[in-house]
Amino acid sequence: MRFLAIALLLVALAGCSKPAEPTNNQVVATPEVGPHKGIDRSHKGAPAPDTTFKNPDGGDISLAKFHGVPVLVNLWATWCAPCVKELPTLDKLAQSHDVDGALGIIAVNQEDKPNTAVDAFLKTTIKARSLGAYQDPNMALMGKLGPDAVLPTTFLYDANGKEVWRYVGDLDWTSPEAARLLSEAGSPVPAPKG
């Protein structure tokens, strides 16, 4: 009996070792801690994907629009607890760059929801003042990440549209760690004030 209990426990734990592979309409949220959370520089120098997604006005946009300035791209969803946890700090970072323009910051929702619903979520739940309701309802950006894609994932692209790093999981974007990571954009990116 004890052997059976141990065997069942091992099978259950093995199922938890890797997130499920997303389908076209499924994305996995990252664990709060674990092997999938942290900085990934293995794609350094890769060009930004040329896929299109929706800007806050509902029009098509691509990351090429941000060429000439480093850009931080956060992929998130309303149902993703780590995403919701980090969005207020990402908004605070975005507020600090509204004036200086040293860093473009966009949060791209990965759900097939009306733009008005995503915008309302950002304004009422997150209390966002600077993050616009960018959307990728077809999850084209997530699709570029491969079968192990999880939310949130945040990318830093340099002014030439080349990936510097990606951060898997939530991060306090107002922290000294985030400021250090953002400084890798190729030009000084000041930490948010306050």
Summary of predicted features, one role per range:
Residues 1-50, 189-194:
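N-terminal targeting signals for export/organelle localization
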Residues 40-45, 50-71:
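A short beta-strand-turn-helix
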Residues 67, 75-92:
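Conserved redox-active cysteine motifs that mediate thiol-disulfide chemistry
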Residues 68-70, 101-104, 129-130, 159:
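Loop/turn elements at helix/coil->beta-strand transitions in domains of secreted/extracellular proteins
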Residues 85-126, 138-144, 194:
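Structural microenvironment flanking redox-active thiols in thiol-disulfide oxidoreductases
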Residues 123-130, 135-184:
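Thiol/disulfide oxidoreductase modules built on the thioredoxin-like
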